[in-house]
Amino acid sequence: MTNVYSLDGLLVFALLFVCTCAYFRKVPRLRSWLLSEKKGVWGVFYKAAVIGSRLHLAVSISCIAMAFYVLFIK
């Protein structure tokens, strides 16, 4: 279990959020329903999806590094 109030927990949450929104961008129904707004509270989902799709290599390497950290070091 990862605590959200610690730095590593916040990083895990942010990475999972970005990866989930990038996945939502690939699914047509979810894209039209969730990622249609670009401003406001719902715009956070759109911005996370853009980060996940444009920086997919950096995000995937970060996910692998964070998984290694959580499983073996922490």
From Swiss-Prot:
InterPro entries on file: Kish-B (IPR042863), Ksh1 (IPR009653)
Extracellular-facing ranges: 23-52
Bilayer topology: Single-pass type I membrane protein
Coiled coil segments of this chain: none
One Pfam family recorded for the sequence: DUF1242
Transmembrane segments: 53-73
Cytoplasmic side: 74
Lineage: superkingdom: Eukaryota
Keyword line: Golgi apparatus, Membrane, Signal, Transmembrane, Transmembrane helix
UniProt KW Ribosomal protein keyword: no
Gene Ontology CC terms: Golgi membrane
Cleaved signal peptide residues: 1-22
Compartment annotation: Golgi apparatus membrane
UniProt KW Ion transport keyword: no
PANTHER family referenced in this protein's UniProt entry, alphabetically: PROTEIN KISH-B
Function noted in UniProt: Involved in the early part of the secretory pathway.
Family according to the record: Belongs to the KISH family.
UniProt protein name: Protein kish-B
Organism (species): Xenopus tropicalis (Western clawed frog)
